[in-house]
Amino acid sequence: MFLLHEYDIFWAFLMISSVIPILAFLISGVLAPIREGPEKLSSYESGIEPMGDAWLQFRIRYYMFALVFVVFDVETVFLYPWAMSFDVLGVSAFIEALIFVLIPIVGSVYAWRKGALEWS
């Protein structure tokens, strides 16, 4: 009753897909020339030498807006398949999707009222 042989193709694929990236890293490490100089160690921004320090600290507001964008973007990705099969799913799926949409909206309203989305 030991059915491990049924997964031979899976194990072969897993081994091959693990060996190829390892070989690529090893071969590039052996063949690539390692030359460090002042030009390679300097920072580079769109073909122009940077003015001032290359490390800037961003305000936390940027991260808040990025986080809100990612939440609603992921929500859109999850809602798209639901919208494509809406006619087949029925009322219970509609209620579940409504709850799924309302949770981030309630969170956004809460953050808005607390002033987390204010730019001042």
Swiss-Prot record:
InterPro entries: NAD(P)H_OxRDtase_bac/plastid, NADH_UbQ/plastoQ_OxRdtase_su3, NDAH_ubi_oxred_su3_sf. It is found in: Plastid, Chloroplast thylakoid membrane. It catalyses: a plastoquinone + NADH + (n+1) H(+)(in) = a plastoquinol + NAD(+) + n H(+)(out); a plastoquinone + NADPH + (n+1) H(+)(in) = a plastoquinol + NADP(+) + n H(+)(out). Gene3D superfamilies: NADH:ubiquinone/plastoquinone oxidoreductase, chain 3. It is an enzyme of class 7 (translocase). It holds the Pfam family Oxidored_q4. Its EC number is 7.1.1.-. Its main location: plastid. One of its GO terms (biological process) is photosynthesis, light reaction. GO terms for molecular function: NADH dehydrogenase (ubiquinone) activity; quinone binding. GO terms for cellular component: chloroplast thylakoid membrane; NADH dehydrogenase complex. Keywords: Chloroplast, Membrane, NAD, NADP, Plastid, Plastoquinone, Quinone, Thylakoid, Translocase, Transmembrane, Transmembrane helix, Transport. The chain crosses the membrane at residues 9-29, 64-84, 88-108. It is a multi-pass membrane protein. NDH is composed of at least 16 different subunits, 5 of which are encoded in the nucleus. Belongs to the complex I subunit 3 family. NDH shuttles electrons from NAD(P)H:plastoquinone, via FMN and iron-sulfur (Fe-S) centers, to quinones in the photosynthetic chain and possibly in a chloroplast respiratory chain. The immediate electron acceptor for the enzyme in this species is believed to be plastoquinone. Couples the redox reaction to proton translocation, and thus conserves the redox energy in a proton gradient. This is NAD(P)H-quinone oxidoreductase subunit 3, chloroplastic. It comes from Illicium oligandrum (Star anise). The gene is ndhC.
